[in-house]
Amino acid sequence: TIYRHDIKYSGEHTDSKLARVREKMKELDANAFFLSSLPDIAWLFNLRGDDIACTPLFYSYAWITIDKCFLFLRKDCISAVAFQRFKEHGISILDYTEVSAFLKDQHETVLLNPDLTNYLHYNLLFKCKIIEDKNPTELMKAIKNDIQIDHLKACHINDGIAMTKFMY
């Protein structure tokens, strides 16, 4: 199951995050960005899942252009409401198994992190000019917004209380 990570926890809408990614793409002269890092995809789209035990991650890939966005995931794991919400925001949901065929047909200047892209997908992009760089989402994820900072503080307080009760 894939579910929405509420804005009251993330502090930023997907549209805003995508706009920041697209700005970074423009800086690097890329007109597409291939994202295969599961934590980055979960963060970018404010989604969580249970495909991988003991993590909030789900199997997925993302292809982002200046004006379009494609999210590849198991369609049977996302609700009709979430599917419609993404459609309204210009995000196309495609089946996880379609990513290879999709990549084979691309001719863009693509930003990707070769350390996080598997060999098959990297080679399928042979028609593309590839810009190898870190995922812009890595740094964006690391810089916390005010809501995230408030939640981190609350977690540390609760953790401190639990440790104190445990020790005494």
Predicted regions and their residues:
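Active-site neighborhoods and metal-handling regions in enzymes and metal-associated proteins
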Residues: 1-168
